[in-house]
Amino acid sequence: MYKKLKLTTISELIKNIYCSLSVLIIGCASAYAVEFNKDLIEAEDRENVNLSQFETDGQLPVGKYSLNALINNKRTPIHLDLQWVLIDNQTAVCLTPEQLTLLGFTDEIIEVAQQNLIDGCYPIEKEKQITTYLDKGKMQLSISAPQAWLKYKDANWTPPELWDHGIAGAFLDYNLYASHYAPHQGDNSQNISSYGQAGVNLGAWRLRTDYQYDQSFNNGKSQANNLDFPRIYLFRPIPAINAKLTIGQYDTESSIFDSFHFSGVSLKSDENMLPPDLRGYAPQITGVAQTNAKVTVSQNNRIIYQENVPPGPFAITNLFNTLQGQLDVKVEEEDGQVTQWQVASNSIPYLTRKGQIRYTTAMGKPTSVGGDSLQQPFFWTGEFSWGWLNNVSLYGGSVLTNRDYQSLAAGVGFNLNSLGSLSFDVTRSDAQLHNQDKETGYSYRANYSKRFESTGSQLTFAGYRFSDKNFVTMNEYINDTNHYTNYQNEKESYIITFNQYLESLRLNTYVSLARNTYWDASSNVNYSLSLSRDFDIGPLKNVSTSLTFSRINWEEDNQDQLYLNISIPWGTSRTLSYGMQRNQDNKISHTASWYDSSDRNKSWSVSASGDNDEFKDMKASLRASYQHNTENGRLYLSGTSQRDSYYSLNASWNGSFTATRHGAAFHDYSGSADSRFMIDADGAEDIPLNNKRAVTNRYGIGVIPSVSSYITTSLSVDTRNLPENVDIENSVITTTLTEGAIGYAKLDTRKSYQIMGVIRLADGSHPPLGISVKDKTSHKELGLVADGGFVYLNGIQDDSKLTLRWGDKSCFIQPPNSSNLTTGTVILPCISQN
């Protein structure tokens, strides 16, 4: 076998050699015809040279060709069948009005094209400000046009006409957890849990069901088990109105009213369909774990996010930006201690561009968590935001029921430019609770956000809300109507966050404060302060230290925590750390740890922690953890042991499985709100995808998880690490998927080999220098004839037949099979077809 040459195509190599000889060619990259001076070519038979295919760059013979298209250097996610027509004795690319629409040209340009069609298409280079360049080797057309002539200005924005709903298929995204806790005295306990989402896609429709399972054991005997399906729903995008339609069990999504679980139908303008700079944000959740702990974020008792975290401060920053309303946070320590609090995910109600409207509406019946029963009352809710002026938006909404509850809200949002963003709204409720008279109440809310560009700081005063005693939310009314009494009548709440990075000091400051008061219950206040700084100590660079103080107030119990951490990088992938923590009992504990991630896909850590007495008595807690990222999922293992006290073991695995009519594959975890992309390598195994984030299985199927929706994404094959004798033609795939889609592409995969040979005609002569050698079936160029008939052929298959054409002559070659191939130069007889 011959080692692959890391080149593009031989034709490009020879072309570049010719282009470098300025005396032979002038303006090689232009679209003008040139004539080669054959006297400067050192060849035995100078006249037997045919370089006609290099004499005109940027042109193709009259006809239709399938090409990739780039518009202002941005790859489009489609192949276009483009025509070349003859104009002024030269061929030029000619686009139909439909193709101009797909490429994102404005209606004005398309109207001009429709008025000047030639054979049903328009030669776009008639517009002086439009230029094209054809890369024949890649069969790729680059179009350069004024940005003002294009509808979409964002480089990552793709016209809805190019969005891909994907193919039919099914998937399961799963998270598995197992734990074992064994105290020195007392009963052992075990727990097995899982949560995730299953789905089926058909066209633009997506069927989804969330699931969560929990099983507890005591000394191996089952104590309790619970299987819930919190949501079963059907949804689809409606690109024509930038909206998402949902039918089934879902949660109301609102920037004004509290969220609740319901069964029915909803329609919401989807800001993910808007350009990226108009999209919202999700909250950051911070806290401190005292041991190896499991952090669970849920809403309406539905698990949204779950993660195992080591001792010390943690931050969850990757929640979906679609979350609205109160989120419940629970930290379960390995010794059974549980800490809970709430955070608000309400963003400042969106400002809307002048003249535009955003909206959401839903109707149905409230549903108990788990979806096993419908509740009263029947409701309809809706809200909107209208861009009244450039910097002023009006918004409002209502909740109407067939019982004794109605709510109406109105507000205004201001873009104060350098002063930040401000919104204010008032909500009125009319409700009659059980055994009470009908009451009218009001709630007032203000939000403010400001980023100080000069200092890089961010201040958010989100969700200040005051409600009088008679104000009733829809959640409170649902609880009262269905005889649930464990709810609190909120009086006042607010959240303040401040973030500041001081570059000169390499110091980052983060402060958050949240307060809730109630008319009929005690108030709670949660706050945290975090300072972190990087510095150098002699040869030790980027040593980091952080100080975190937090107070969590829950059900009249204050939990104060203080944590100091110092981390010393040891090379580029190892870290030595020391942490000191003071808990609510004023006990001080110390932790020393070592973390190693020198292997790209594996990491491990060991630590010892305890207070002064525990270290003195050799009773410090010893912990170890191991994480392994694979193409099929992520494995996490951890264990803790404390002499004469307890030991615990924890394990988790998360991954996904996707199946379509083209095949199926296990793969890395894909977030349930994300799309995914299936690659079919035509049976080729171990094809690395997207920098080895995924690999094709034994059937040639691989799935790239967590592909962003409504954003142009390029997916690639790592051609540098292909298996031996495998070639990929279309190594880059560009796509724009709609939410939840299963994208699909089949690679032009060739299990092939290479040949170095000399082409010999029947009379012993050789074909002219520069002639293309092409595959007879695919017409793909496999090599170019050099001096003396020498040729390097790449991409040969056992059933390949090769053809050569020059002038009125042609011949074909039957190359030897790979099993019969010998080393050295091979004589390749070319049999005349004339």
Give the role of each language-model region.
Residues 149, 178-182, 204, 213-217, ...:
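Transmembrane beta-strands of outer-membrane beta-barrel pores
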Residues 81, 692-701, 778-790:
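Short, acidic Ser/Thr/Gly-rich low-complexity loop/linker segments typical of extracellular
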Residues 95, 162-219, 357-430, 453, ...:
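Conserved, compact domain cores that house catalytic/ligand-binding motifs in diverse enzymes
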Residues 86-95, 319-324, 701-727, 738-739, ...:
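Short Pro-Gly-centered beta-turn/loop motif in secreted/extracellular proteins
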Residues 23, 27, 31-279, 584-658:
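Post-signal-peptide, soluble extracytosolic/periplasmic N-terminal scaffold domains
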Residues 69, 285-287, 676-681, 753-761:
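A short, amphipathic beta-strand motif
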Residues 163-164, 192-204, 225-239, 376-398, ...:
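Feature captures outer-membrane beta-barrel proteins of Gram-negative bacteria and organelles
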Residues 60-83, 293, 683-693, 762-778:
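Short, ordered, surface-exposed loop/turn motifs in non-cytosolic proteins
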